[in-house]
Amino acid sequence: MQVILLENVDKLGYKDDIVTVKNGYGRNFLIPKKKAIFASKTAKKVLAENLRQQVRKLEKIKKDAQTLANKLMNISLTIGAKTSSNGIIFGSITNIQIADELAKKGVQIERKLISIKEHIKEIGSYKATLRLHKDIVIDIPFEVIAE
């Protein structure tokens, strides 16, 4: 079954993408939750016309994301956490703490755009992935230190 995504769906696609999904996933989850519509011929024509009209807007959004990515390349983050005597963190470091540190540096990023591949439970250096645009993905190094 082909559907047109109405919003970004993790591990599936981005808004206005035409993707193939299993029938049950499309009918029981994506379409009822208003995350997608069935990709009929008329829906595809409407999508093509909308995309033609949005080309300039999308180029500006991509340019802004690239500018932000260039700005973020020079930023290094240090996150303080309470630790035990042998360097293990009480709790863990999540995308919320990274978004807060970026906000302190003057860069507002939604925490949904930040992903960390591993669970951070110890002091050390790590990398977080920021998905600023569907074509622009950068890694930001950060260090976890004891408070």
From Swiss-Prot:
Pfam families: Ribosomal_L9_C (PF03948), Ribosomal_L9_N (PF01281). GO terms for cellular component: ribonucleoprotein complex; ribosome. GO terms for molecular function: rRNA binding; structural constituent of ribosome. Keywords: Ribonucleoprotein, Ribosomal protein, RNA-binding, rRNA-binding. GO terms for biological process: translation. InterPro entries: Ribosomal_bL9, Ribosomal_bL9/RNase_H1_N, Ribosomal_bL9_bac/chp, Ribosomal_bL9_C, Ribosomal_bL9_C_sf, Ribosomal_bL9_N, Ribosomal_bL9_N_sf. Gene3D superfamilies: Ribosomal protein L9, C-terminal domain, Ribosomal protein L9, N-terminal domain. The keyword Cytoplasm does not apply. The keyword Metal-binding does not apply. Belongs to the bacterial ribosomal protein bL9 family. PANTHER family: 50S RIBOSOMAL PROTEIN L9. Binds to the 23S rRNA. This is Large ribosomal subunit protein bL9.
